[in-house]
Amino acid sequence: MTQPENNAIRDLVIVGGGTAGWMMAAAAARVLAGGVRRITLIESDAIGTVGVGEATIPPIHGFNELLGIEEQEFLDATKGTFKLAIQFENWGQVGERYFHPFGKTGRDFDGIAFHQLWSWLRDREGVGPLEDYSMSAVAARNGRFARPDANPRSPLSNLVYAYHFDATLYAAFLRDYAIERGVVRVEGRIVDVELDGESGHVSSVGLEDGASIPGDLFIDCSGFRSLLLGDALGVGFNDWSHWLPCDRALAVPSASDEQIAPFTNSHAHGAGWQWRIPLQHRTGNGHVYASAFMDHDEAERLLMANLKTPPLGECRPLRFQTGVRERLWDRNVVALGLAGGFLEPLESTSIHLIQTGIAKLLALF
């Protein structure tokens, strides 16, 4: 690898687009403006991305604020909706539902945490569910939404929210943002990775058309392929499937509901669970399941039988392996998103894990 004598990072190369790649590109363009010579992102239109409807958690606000993105512009571009909570259905008993809300639940009393007080009273007084004391959960249950009130005395000041949005549209939105700020997009399929003979660092990547893209630091956003960290550098994979056996998913869009719910729905099935993510223009649905305990046909039957609105297409199958690379940073390659690992997004944390990785990396510059 050719690198300046002071070891400064001048050429940053991002391999792969999608949500992870364009989040990295947009954040780097914003934070490293003037600090690096060139930011290049390589992607191929011939290689698809996993992109489905995405649900997030509240720290996504921090990422948008970092980029200086206006909320309404973001929602319009991504067909986004508001999210106050996750509703879990059938996870305890069949027919049982409960909310995992964002924000505060109740109020601490005389140094006693509210959930401890609630637990004590429940055993003695028969008080209602914990979610009854969360403004976010009560609003979500009633299909209502409001932005938090700035007045701390208002009950609405306890509202905390995140978003649902179309992942493909989100990547396109961030792509335009990044390119406007100087990121160079290169269209092409990577067919070769050149390693430095002495250090073992990645010195360049070769494209199908013969072009060679050199760099000082490479960000692997190539998805499950893990083209640089896994394939080129040989970093091993810690398989977690003995703990988390789900290894398949089916995804299908359906029509938008007349009443857009301000929450993500997670519905437990016999060998997995089903998500429902409401967007402006459609509803994202999917069934994550363990193929050792359920076959494809049964998984698809359950998914389609539990759609709330008519399907807009065919089921798309996905295969995955739960786990993480032994190292997410090896030599001059850092992996983000699926290139580094995968955990089924039961708590809507996929994008948050990307965001956290980006923040930790950029803090080192």
Segments (PLM) and residue ranges:
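Beta1/beta-strand and adjacent pyrophosphate-binding region of the FAD-binding site
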Residues: 6-18
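N-terminal Rossmann-fold NAD(P) dinucleotide-binding loop
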Residues: 21
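A short, Lys/Arg-enriched amphipathic alpha-helix followed by its capping loop at the start of a domain
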Residues: 24-37, 63, 181
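Glycine-rich FAD pyrophosphate-binding loop
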Residues: 29-52
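Dinucleotide-binding Rossmann-like beta1-alpha1 core, especially the glycine-rich loop
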Residues: 48-140
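Conserved N-terminal helical subregion
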Residues: 98-192
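Predominantly flavin-linked oxidoreductase catalytic cores and closely associated redox partners
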Residues: 152-303, 358
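FAD/FMN-dependent oxidoreductases across multiple families
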Residues: 280, 289-365
